[in-house]
């Protein structure tokens, strides 16, 4: 569904920036004095590649290093996402530097209604329109296109422009001239989402139009969109329609791929009902997730065929007649982690010895005039399951020659033409390529060495698959040398192979307690996580995390602050009418009106996190377990710490023990509250008729008896040596509770009990929120299952 920029001016740009056409800002842009083109990645002729052109506005000459750093971040985020990661070599990337006279852009909410003298005239509020949405960040389209036109060989038909504004305020717009604020936490995620539209022709999966308002029920016919449907799984399978080949698969972006079924994923095309998407969340619905397999297949097809051209870019000896003594060659593009298939035939009979070769010397084949030589170039990627897509010209090309008149002789010295660039480190699983010069009567030879040893993984030596070697951690030296079998010339290329995996060390908020013997933390109401992705190489390192296996999600800090940790709560946090950090059944992020239809995420979760470095290495995930339980904020009327001799009696108020060492029995009487954090109770605990009893990470020696409590009993991650009895306690849900109205019982989670446990008469029954207790004695009553 496409609408004009005016119609969409009030749309959420945190999630819908890519819907908007690149609108022309009313502001006058400055002349492009001092502009320069910086090629960042050139893997082929612009006519044979998809070209990404990055612009910057509001950066002074002195701020150009900042611009380059932010561009590095944007690109490395994009290259971490499939299929961009695997098809990176199908892209050329150019930076056009356009220094501005002043720093910043027009009408940035962080700086008031100020105008700035900039090269591209970028501005918030649709170019300082008071009636527009502040996040609608626009650019002077004439100036932006003029800047992009500076890139030789690149035209509007084979490029995507992304204009970055020097601002930390979130904003953006979309189309083939997309915009984003460069310093915001989420801005690096706009470019991949926008390419899904402009390159992949994919549609939005949002169930809303305005962030807090859906268009409601979808009433149209079966959508033309490749990733929206009205079909049930049964019908989709029967008709072999849409994404039937992916049904039931675990989604790369979380959950299970489904259709219009009771357990399907309802919502999309700005409607919340009666239209279904394949997965619970993908980047088409929520910034931060990957494409699911359905969207990834479409994107792979479109990237391979260079968008609307729909043709795999293959270079070759010109089709037609060739001599029986000639050599013919063909060269397709180079995926990063696999190779294209090259299948040669003569008069329909396959030449199995030549399988995978990009060149064929005819002299040894004893061919008669009129013989037909063909080669089929095909991408075997597992990202594509539809045989029609694989057989299309975008992924399969067949070239044919007939033996007849010889080619006009062409001599060439041994040398490399196109190759994997040597400036950037190679990943440990990459397929490195090196194309050579091509005389008409012979094929150059290429030899590879890895750390001084001769290696080979391909028929013709034009590629080396490093994934075959299971390289140990550290840097390695890879070289390729081309020689002429009939001459003395040669050339050598050398790469550094980075086989050191990156990591993403975590910093968690302080837990109420930690379960003994592992990375299992217990939290009241919420927790936060800061990742600090790191690597021994250069370039921006991407961090990712996922919760309960539900799809890897980009780590960006927090939507409002890239330096802040990511915050997890059972229902998420509303940030500008979108919800973030939800542990509930709907995933990490959703529209505000979706929260009520999902189960809140109280209880136990597994969080994994990892990093991806600029070379493309993916680090092994680390993980921890977090249990989130409800708990009221209690204001201490008295705080006790240090050593307490002779025991302790609590008769009124809220007495808090902060790391205290109580030597003697603790007694809590009617209406009083006891909150213990850490420390030790060396004499047991007896509470009768108390208001609240809460122990977190506490060591208790002696029996514990808690009965008749009127509001809360919570024992978290504590070590008890002695019998435990919980009887006739009433648990009143904390004001943070968002689960079922029936509430929850006394909380006994993640404790170690060296003694018997007996529970009876508690209302509701005792619960552990998924954090099992380690009990060595007998267990009876309501605690039997804990």
Please place each PLM-identified region on the residue numbering.
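Propeptide-to-catalytic entry region of secreted or membrane-anchored zinc metalloproteases
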Residues: 30-148, 182, 383
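Secretory targeting and sorting signals
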Residues: 1-29
């Amino acid at each position: 569904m496409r609408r004009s920029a005016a119609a969409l001016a009030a749309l959420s740009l945190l999630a819908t920036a890519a819907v908007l056409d690149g609108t022309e800002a009313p502001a006058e842009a400055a002349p492009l004095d001092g502009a320069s083109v910086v090629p960042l990645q050139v893997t082929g002729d612009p006519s044979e590649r998809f070209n990404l052109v990055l612009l910057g506005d509001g950066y002074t000459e002195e701020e150009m290093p900042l611009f380059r750093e932010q561009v590095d971040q944007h690109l490395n985020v994009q290259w971490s996402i499939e299929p961009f990661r695997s098809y990176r070599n199908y892209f050329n990337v150019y930076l056009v530097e356009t220094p501005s006279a002043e720093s910043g852009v027009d009408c940035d909410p962080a700086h008031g209604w100020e105008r700035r003298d900039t090269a591209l005239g970028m501005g918030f509020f649709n170019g300082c329109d008071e009636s527009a949405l502040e996040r609608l960040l626009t650019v002077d389209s004439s100036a932006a296109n003029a800047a992009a036109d500076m890139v030789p060989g690149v035209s509007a038909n084979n490029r995507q422009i992304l204009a970055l504004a020097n601002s930390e305020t979130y904003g953006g717009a979309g189309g083939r001239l997309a915009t984003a604020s460069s310093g915001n936490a989420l801005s690096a995620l706009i470019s991949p989402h926008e390419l899904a539209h402009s390159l992949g022709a994919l549609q939005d999966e949002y169930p809303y139009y305005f962030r807090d308002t859906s268009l409601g029920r979808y009433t149209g016919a079966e959508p033309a969109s490749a990733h929206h449907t009205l079909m049930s799984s049964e019908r989709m399978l029967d008709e072999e329609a849409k994404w039937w080949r992916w049904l039931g698969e675990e989604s790369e972006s979380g959950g299970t791929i489904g259709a219009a079924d009771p357990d399907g994923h309802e919502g999309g095309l700005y409607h919340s009902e009666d239209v279904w998407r394949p997965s619970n969340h993908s980047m088409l619905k929520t910034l931060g997730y990957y494409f699911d397999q359905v969207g990834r297949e479409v994107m792979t097809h479109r990237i391979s065929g260079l968008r609307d051209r729909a043709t795999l870019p293959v270079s070759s000896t010109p089709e037609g007649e060739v001599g029986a003594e000639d050599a013919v060659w063909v060269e397709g593009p180079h995926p990063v982690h696999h190779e294209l298939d090259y299948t040669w035939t003569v008069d329909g009979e396959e030449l199995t010895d030549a399988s995978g070769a990009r060149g064929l010397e005819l002299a040894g084949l004893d061919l008669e005039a009129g013989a037909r030589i063909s080669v089929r170039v095909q991408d075997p990627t597992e990202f594509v399951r539809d045989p029609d897509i694989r057989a299309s010209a975008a992924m399969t090309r067949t070239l044919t020659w007939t033996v007849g008149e010889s080619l006009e002789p062409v001599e060439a010295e041994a040398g490399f033409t196109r190759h994997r660039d040597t400036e950037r480190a190679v990943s440990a699983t990459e397929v490195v390529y090196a194309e050579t010069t091509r005389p008409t009567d012979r094929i150059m030879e290429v030899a590879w060495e890895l750390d001084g040893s001769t290696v080979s993984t391909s028929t013709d030596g034009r590629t080396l698959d490093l994934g075959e070697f299971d390289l140990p951690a550290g840097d390695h030296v890879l070289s390729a040398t081309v020689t002429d079998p009939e001459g003395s010339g040669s050339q050598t290329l050398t790469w550094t192979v980075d086989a050191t995996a990156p990591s993403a060390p975590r910093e968690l908020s302080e837990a109420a307690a930690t379960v003994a013997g592992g990375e299992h933390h217990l939290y009241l109401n919420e927790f936060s996580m800061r990742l600090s992705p790191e690597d021994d190489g250069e370039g921006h390192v991407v961090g990712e995390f996922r919760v309960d296996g539900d799809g890897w999600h980009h780590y960006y800090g927090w939507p409002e602050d890239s330096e802040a940790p990511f915050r997890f709560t059972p229902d998420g946090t509303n940030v500008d009418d979108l919800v973030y950090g939800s542990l509930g059944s709907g995933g990490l992020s959703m529209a505000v009106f979706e929260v009520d239809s999902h189960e809140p995420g109280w209880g136990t979760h597994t969080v994994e996190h990892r990093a991806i470095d600029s070379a493309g290495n993916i680090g092994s995930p680390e993980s921890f377990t977090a249990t989130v339980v409800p708990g009221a904020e209690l204001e201490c009327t008295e705080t006790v710490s240090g050593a307490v001799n002779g025991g302790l009696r609590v008769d009124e108020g809220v007495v808090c023990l902060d790391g205290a060492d109580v030597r003697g029995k603790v007694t809590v009487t009617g209406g009083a509250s006891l909150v213990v954090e850490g420390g030790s109770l060396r004499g047991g605990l007896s509470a009768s008729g108390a208001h609240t009893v809460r122990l977190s990470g506490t060591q208790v020696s002696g029996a514990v008896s808690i009965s008749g409590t009127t509001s809360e009993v919570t024992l978290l991650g504590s070590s008890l040596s002695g019998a435990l009895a919980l009887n006739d306690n009433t648990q009143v849900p904390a004001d943070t509770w968002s689960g079922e109205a029936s509430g929850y019982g006394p909380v006994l989670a993640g404790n170690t009990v060296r003694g018997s446990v007996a529970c009876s008469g508690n209302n509701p029954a005792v619960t552990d929120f998924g954090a099992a207790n380690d009990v060595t004695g007998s267990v009876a009553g309501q605690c039997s299952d804990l």
